[in-house]
C-alpha cells in the first residue's frame, strides 16, 4: 500500500457518519440480537394438510385449518396466547393477517406464518446459539459516494418473478418497477417492490463472497410526497434475515439485480465470537 492510499480508518475520518446512520446501525444490532430477534430463530415447521401433528420440541398438536393454524393444547402445556394458557382448540392467525396471533412457551416465541398459501410455525428461542455467539454486524465505513438519487420506472403491469429462496425452493417475488441510477456515466437498474412511497430491493454486487454475504437488501423511499425523488443510500444496505438464521427463506436477487459494481457500503456479514 502506498503512503497516500487511504485506509478504511482514514476514509471514515474524512467522511464521518451522520448521527442518523450511527443510530440506525445501533438499532439494527439491537433488533437482530433481541431475545426474539432474527438470531433467535431456531426452527420453521411447515404444516401439511391432514390430521394434527406434534412438532419437534413443542407441546400440543398443530394443524392447518383453512387459512389459519389450529392448535390443540391443555393448560399443563403452558402454551400462552395473550398471557392465557390454551385450553382446547385455538385458531391462530398467521403473520400476514391483519391481527396475527403469537404464542409463548417457556420463554420462546411461536409465530404462525404463511408463504404462498403454505402455513408454518416459527420458533424463536432466546437461548439460540446464534445469539450467544453474535459479535455485532460488520459494516463498511460510511461512504457518501454511494448515496444516489434514483428515478422510478414502473412496469406497465407489475409481475411476479419466480426466484430461488435460501432454502433451495423457488417462490414468487412481486416486482413493480425499476429504480434507475447512474455512476461514472454508467446506468444501473434494480427491480423493486413498491409499497406506497417505499421501495424494497434485493441485490447482489461484486463484493459478495470475498467481503460480504451473498446478497443484501435495501429500502428506499420518496424524499418528498409528490416529488418522485428517490434516494438510494447503500450505506443502509442490510443483511437479509437468512444471514442470521438458516431457518429463514429469503429470496435471492431477481434476474438483473446483480450489479457489476462494488458496493463498499452498508452491512457486510454477521460477526461471530471466535
Language-model segments: residues:
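Actinobacteria-biased recognition of intrinsically disordered, low-complexity terminal regions
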Residues: 1-19, 23-26, 273-274
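Extracellular/luminal recognition modules and glycoprotein regions
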Residues: 27, 32-53, 57
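Forkhead-associated
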Residues: 47-94, 225
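Broad, structure-driven detector of short, well-ordered beta-strand segments within folded domains
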Residues: 59-67, 108-114, 188-192
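Phosphate/adenylate-binding glycine loop and adjacent helical scaffold
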Residues: 78, 84-111, 117, 132
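Surface-exposed beta-loop interaction hotspot
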Residues: 106-175, 182
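Acidic/His-leaning functional-site neighborhoods
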Residues: 180-226, 235
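Extended, aromatic/histidine-rich regions of cofactor-dependent oxidoreductases associated
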Residues: 229, 235-274
Amino acid at each position: 500500500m502506498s503512503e497516500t492510499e487511504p485506509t478504511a480508518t482514514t476514509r471514515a475520518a474524512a467522511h464521518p457518519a451522520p448521527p442518523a446512520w450511527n443510530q440506525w446501525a445501533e438499532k439494527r444490532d439491537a433488533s437482530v440480537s433481541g431475545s426474539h430477534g432474527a438470531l433467535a430463530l431456531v426452527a420453521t415447521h411447515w404444516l401439511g394438510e391432514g390430521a394434527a401433528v406434534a412438532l419437534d420440541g413443542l407441546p400440543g398438536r398443530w394443524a392447518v385449518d383453512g387459512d389459519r393454524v389450529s392448535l390443540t393444547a391443555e393448560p399443563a402445556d403452558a402454551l400462552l396466547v395473550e398471557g392465557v394458557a390454551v385450553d382446547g382448540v385455538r385458531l391462530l392467525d398467521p403473520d400476514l393477517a391483519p391481527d396475527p396471533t403469537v404464542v409463548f412457551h417457556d420463554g420462546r416465541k411461536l409465530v404462525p406464518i404463511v408463504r404462498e398459501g403454505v402455513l408454518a410455525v416459527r420458533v424463536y428461542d432466546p437461548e439460540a446459539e446464534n445469539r450467544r455467539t453474535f459479535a455485532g454486524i460488520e459494516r463498511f465505513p460510511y461512504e457518501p459516494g454511494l448515496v444516489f438519487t434514483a428515478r422510478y420506472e414502473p412496469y406497465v403491469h407489475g409481475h411476479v418473478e419466480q426466484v430461488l429462496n435460501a432454502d433451495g425452493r423457488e417462490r414468487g417475488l412481486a416486482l413493480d418497477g425499476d429504480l434507475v441510477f447512474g455512476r461514472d456515466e454508467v446506468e444501473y437498474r434494480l427491480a423493486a417492490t413498491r409499497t406506497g412511497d417505499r421501495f424494497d430491493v434485493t441485490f447482489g454486487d461484486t463484493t459478495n463472497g470475498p467481503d460480504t454475504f451473498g446478497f443484501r437488501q435495501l429500502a428506499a423511499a420518496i424524499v418528498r410526497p409528490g416529488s418522485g425523488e428517490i434516494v438510494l443510500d447503500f450505506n443502509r444496505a442490510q443483511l437479509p434475515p437468512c444471514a442470521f438464521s438458516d431457518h429463514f427463506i429469503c429470496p435471492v436477487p431477481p434476474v438483473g439485480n446483480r450489479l457489476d459494481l462494488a458496493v463498499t457500503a452498508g452491512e457486510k456479514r454477521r460477526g461471530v465470537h471466535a
